[in-house]
């Protein structure tokens, strides 16, 4: 169908585009959205005195799966580590100089900042309209500098998902420095160093974060912070996978090897889904989470069936729009949840299956409509020049082509950032 392709087509800004990675992003964003969707009904019904009866085995299974949805953020961190490190790793293996830091930062700013600022303005307007008494402009000013969570800690912040974006920015700034590890010529030394760093960062994460204070599925032992340290291990996993991917061909002609990676991917997913409950008892949960994410990341690149499924148009389309979905999903979930709350409260499992999960999926799909407007234009690395030309020439067609994700002639012109 031509219409959906035109509407949702992404505009990859890199020749290293891997559709299966976007497919993996789709799993991460669905996990996060469903976690927030189920969490809304869980908290509201606890406040109403519901969910007091003994749960069935089915209820427990659904709760077990949904309670791990917040780990989609850690999967995003691992994906970011992989995507940002891969160009550095490939250039190092080819004997080329690393990407220019100025161009690297400029690209992060022009790609990531505009949708974030749009979302920040959206939540500021929503706060003024919905809860003007709790609106604090200073919080949004801090959010504009990716520093809100470092200075404020209260429940009036509508843009609560911004905490992970602030941590992502911290990693973006130091990723080129960390990527100097790829200049080491010995694979054993490179990967050994990364492995030791992952273990050390994981140990720090375990000691820092094993302090659950909220009821499941909203909190528990794995609490997030405001700075990169507790999350660094997940980014480093992505860097380790990038190093392996830069030296080992991702596709294997051996069917048995590919099948083994399919199995490894499933095993990794099960480890991730088991890690949360394990965290209640010991730091073994952090280990399970780290190993699970490593198997999921590498299995996505090396498997056959899983890789093929993730690279399909629908998963890669949803994953390509995950930034838009992540930025804007909290408020639609709260609005729809308020409307649907009277339909819930009898049984946790049925509430999740019949209301929370369908609502989360519906919000995810509906937010795809925002993607061409708030994100896709900025995936073209030359959008600032295109916008200037559109204003000078009064050419609305240039803006429309940016929204449609079509490359412009300027993409072939030399620029200062290239």
Specify the residue positions occupied by each region the protein language model found:
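Alpha-helical transmembrane segments of multi-pass integral membrane proteins
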Residues: 231, 235, 239-240, 262-376
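Conserved protein kinase catalytic core
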Residues: 42, 249, 335
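Generic structural signal for alpha-helix termini and adjacent loop/cap motifs
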Residues: 36, 91, 244-247, 303
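Membrane-interface helix-boundary motifs at transmembrane edges
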Residues: 94, 98, 181-189, 245-257, ...
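Hydrophobic, membrane-facing alpha-helical anchors
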Residues: 25, 119-122, 145, 211-214, ...
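Membrane-cytosol interface segments of multi-pass membrane proteins
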Residues: 1-209, 321-322, 339, 343-418
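Interfacial loop-to-helix transition and helix-capping segments at the boundaries
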Residues: 16-19, 61-73, 155-167, 207-237, ...
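Signature aromatic-anchored transmembrane alpha helix within multi-pass, membrane-resident enzymes
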Residues: 194-199, 255-271
């Amino acid at each position: 169908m031509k219409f959906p392709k035109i509407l949702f087509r992404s505009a990859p800004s890199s020749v290293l585009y891997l559709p299966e990675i976007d497919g993996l992003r789709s799993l991460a964003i669905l996990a996060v959205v469903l976690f927030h969707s189920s969490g809304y009904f869980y908290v509201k019904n606890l406040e109403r005195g519901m969910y007091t009866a003994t749960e069935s085995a089915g209820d427990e299974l659904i709760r077990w799966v949904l309670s791990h949805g917040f780990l989609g953020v850690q999967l995003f961190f691992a994906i970011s580590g992989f995507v940002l490190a891969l160009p550095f790793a490939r250039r190092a293996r080819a004997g080329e100089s690393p990407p220019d830091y100025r161009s690297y930062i400029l690209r992060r700013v022009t790609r990531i900042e505009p949708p974030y600022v749009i979302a920040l303005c959206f939540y500021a307007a929503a706060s003024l309209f919905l809860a003007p008494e709790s609106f604090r402009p200073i919080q949004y000013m801090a959010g504009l500098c990716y520093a809100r969570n470092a200075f404020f800690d209260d429940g009036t912040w509508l843009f609560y998902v911004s905490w992970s974006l602030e941590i992502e920015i911290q990693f973006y700034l130091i990723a080129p420095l960390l990527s100097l590890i790829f200049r080491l010529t010995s694979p054993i030394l490179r990967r050994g160093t990364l492995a030791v760093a992952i273990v050390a960062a994981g140990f720090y994460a375990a000691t820092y974060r094993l302090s659950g204070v909220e009821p499941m599925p909203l909190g528990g032992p794995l609490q997030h912070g405001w700075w990169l340290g507790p999350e660094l291990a997940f980014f480093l996993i992505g860097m380790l996978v990038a190093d392996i991917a830069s030296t080992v061909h991702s596709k294997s002609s051996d069917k048995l090897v590919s099948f083994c990676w399919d199995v490894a991917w499933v095993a990794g997913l099960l480890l991730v889904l088991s890690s949360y409950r394990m965290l209640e008892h010991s730091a073994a949960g952090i280990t399970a989470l780290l190993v699970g994410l490593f198997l999921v990341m590498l299995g996505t690149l090396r498997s056959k069936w899983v890789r093929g499924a993730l690279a399909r148009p629908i998963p890669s389309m949803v994953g390509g729009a995950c930034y838009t979905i992540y930025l804007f999903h909290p408020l639609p979930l709260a609005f729809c949840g308020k409307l649907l709350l009277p339909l819930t409260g009898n049984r946790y499992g049925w509430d999740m299956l019949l209301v929370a999960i369908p609502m989360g999926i519906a919000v995810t799909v509906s937010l795809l409509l925002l993607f061409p407007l708030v994100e896709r234009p900025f995936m073209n690395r030359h959008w600032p020049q295109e916008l200037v030309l559109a204003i000078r020439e009064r050419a609305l067609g240039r803006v429309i082509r940016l929204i449609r994700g079509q490359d412009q002639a300027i993409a072939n012109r030399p620029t200062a950032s290239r």
